[in-house]
């Protein structure tokens, strides 16, 4: 929603936003079940107005080849990729390519558990070890990219949302 709003305000005019991994499916759930969203979003979706989850700025990463193309791009891009703890998933490929470059930034939007690569990065690790399938093992990767943490984002429900959901369940 934040990125879609920035785009609609002209702040991300020519910056593509790629969704890689289960993020695409999770975003689709918001459109499929708008009754769990706030009134403003729900009404936009029900009235076929500007559904922020289906904005033209979002591009699905369809293949490993497409991911490699994105990793090799020279122009700015935003990539939302799983896994949140930086212990697997598509984010590892982006990290391998972009960590050494100081003109890249990784933004953490969630909690990083103890012992995870994500936590080590947040704590300022200047080198991490990642699996390299070409070399068949772990290789050191220098971390020169910028690292930021943006609190307040979560893919999980808060207590109020969980309680509201529980009230709707009807046992069989």
Predicted regions and their residues:
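Acidic/His-rich, metal-assisted hydrolase cores and their charged scaffolds
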Residues: 1-172
